[in-house]
Amino acid sequence: MKNFKFIISYDGSRYFGWERQPGRDTIQGKLEAVLTRMCGTDVQVIGAGRTDAGVHAKAMAANAYMDTERTPDEVRDYMNRYLPDDICVQEAKLAADRFHARYRAAGKLYTYTCYVGDTKPVFNRKYVTVLDYQPDLAAMQRAAEYLTGEHDYKSFCSNPQMKKSTVRIVDSIEIVRRKDLLYFNYHGTGFLQNMVRILTGTLLEVGQGKRTPESVKAALEAKDRTQAGYTAPPQGLCLMRVDY
């Protein structure tokens, strides 16, 4: 039995997220179906994270234990031959037996993209969230300073039944504008359910003048979901990289 590591890109627009669900199209489900076909026995694919419905990935890391004589390149090519066009295995290689895509991950980089142009974005509309206002970049950057570091991010988690620790480390939040696109780059050791989208929604409320930068600090300290901002739509979010 060999342990294969994969780097996978996908357009999450038509999927119900990463995690397999009976009767629904998911990324994990599609990958497992192809590998099970290839091996002739059930194969479980372990992802570095579980992206939500409609969220994309440029470089999701995953691994799977398989009994096959195919080389990593042959496995990659087989998968890409039978996967839908909106999922692509960029890389396949052999990993150490103990490698686990989720538990060995040291950090993740997510980017949330907003469109702030004057006209509708035709060609990248599935990968951005369109804003009908010009957010205050400086105010959002000030607010982001309160959100970096090691904190209890319970206010920014959509799962009220979360029993495990909601303490996480967010190393950096970078907010930059390039022409008609506004990028929110988040790097951290791990993120809670919907956390990046709630952080983004909260920062956008600051940018729109609906709350002050200082209110973000109060929301963080409250450990109460109702004190943070709205959950930004899924299409603007993309997992860019997983660090090991």
Segments (PLM) and residue ranges:
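Structured-RNA-binding interfaces characteristic of tRNA pseudouridine synthases
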Residues: 1-244
